[in-house]
Design a protein with these regions (language model features):
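Long, charged, low-complexity, helical-prone intrinsically disordered regions
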Residues: 1-330
Length: 330
């Protein structure tokens, strides 16, 4: 049945929310939903995870993958921190590399790391006389251009910085263009989301809408995606959806703000759940029967969060009947 309800049911299955993933399936899921992010407002250094999707402790698992340098850190979506498989670094460098605009401080640090690295920020401060507030933005500029690499393999503060090509000698950050990289990653995301709009993909990857829309149109021209409603479906899923009714996910899950389901369509969702009260914001979104239909409003703190209200987009009677179920999820 080619309906949004069946699409949603298949999406929940592909996200491993209907049935949790073992290690091999989890690795494929993580790859398709990369760059992986930490839980929003997490403790410093916590490994990335995909909440409620693994049949094991994926925070511990991804921490181990970080220590083995299977997962590595970079600055990806809008300069934000994320973690990708080291084997995928060239692809994501092509997707996110920003043109390098040298400054006096960035060139000084680049030369110093090349000569003396790996170095931590404290050593750079001591050797250059620069302040941390001068060093950090210069390192971020170099990191976004994939010229240096921050080796965060555990939760410690004392992290070494290397020249990128020293850590990844076989990776050419300029080999893959952004347009080509989008043609590779968008089918992965579409496979997991099943139904994907250009706006969803733009929010997920944090890239210009024009670039994302052009890539999706090209994938449709190639027959990899097909147009449906306001977005696209993977072409291979159309007969599957027409022939099979998938079991829907029933229940309520609380999703943190970096969850992949939240990141798709995040811009519109932020507007819809904007609180008129100063100091109140979304702390979690509520996935109700496979669709985001509510949010927990409050204020983040170190320690227990403030909880102000629970907003729901449900009929009043249904919300009343499911009150305890919703509160348990929160």
């Amino acid at each position: 049945m080619l309906t949004m309800e069946n699409v949603t049911a298949l999406r929940m299955r592909r996200h491993c929310l209907t049935r949790r993933a073992g290690a091999a399936e989890y690795d494929a899921l993580y790859r398709d939903l990369s760059p992986g992010l930490n839980v929003h407002w997490h403790g410093f250094g916590q490994p990335p995870c995909l909440v409620e999707r693994a049949d094991f402790d994926d925070v511990e698992y991804n921490g181990r993958r970080q220590r083995q340098r299977i997962l590595v850190k970079g600055r990806f979506q809008n300069g934000n921190i994320g973690f990708v498989e080291a084997a995928q670094m060239e692809l994501f460098a092509g997707l996110y590399r920003r043109p390098y605009k040298p400054t006096e401080h960035s060139e000084l640090l680049r030369e110093l790391i090349g000569r003396e690295g790996p170095l931590n920020i404290e050593a750079m401060k001591r050797m250059t006389g620069l302040l941390v507030k001068q060093i950090t933005p210069a390192l971020h500029r170099l990191q976004e251009a994939f010229l240096v690499f921050e080796d965060q393999f555990d939760g410690e503060w004392d992290r070494g910085w290397y020249l990128f090509d020293e850590m990844f000698p076989d990776v050419d950050p300029a080999r893959i263009s952004r347009a080509e990289a989008l043609l590779r990653v968008l089918p992965r995301l579409a496979h997991r989301q099943v139904y994907l709009t250009a706006a969803d993909a733009k929010d997920f990857y944090g890239l210009p809408a024009r670039d994302v829309a052009a890539a999706m149109e090209e994938l449709a021209r190639q027959g990899i995606l097909v147009r449906w409603r306001e977005g696209y479906l993977p072409a291979q899923d159309v007969p599957l959806l027409q022939a099979q009714a998938f079991e829907p996910l029933r229940g309520v899950l609380a999703l943190h703000r970096n969850d992949p389901l939240v990141r798709c369509g995040e811009s519109a969702r932020k507007e819809r759940y904007k609180s008129p009260e100063k100091g109140s914001e979304v702390t979690q979104y509520l996935l109700v029967d496979g669709v985001i239909r509510g949010a927990v409003m409050g204020h983040f703190r170190y320690g227990p969060y403030d909880l102000h209200a629970v907003w729901l987009e449900l009929p009043e009677q249904e919300a009343a009947v499911r009150r305890d179920e919703i509160l348990r999820a929160v």
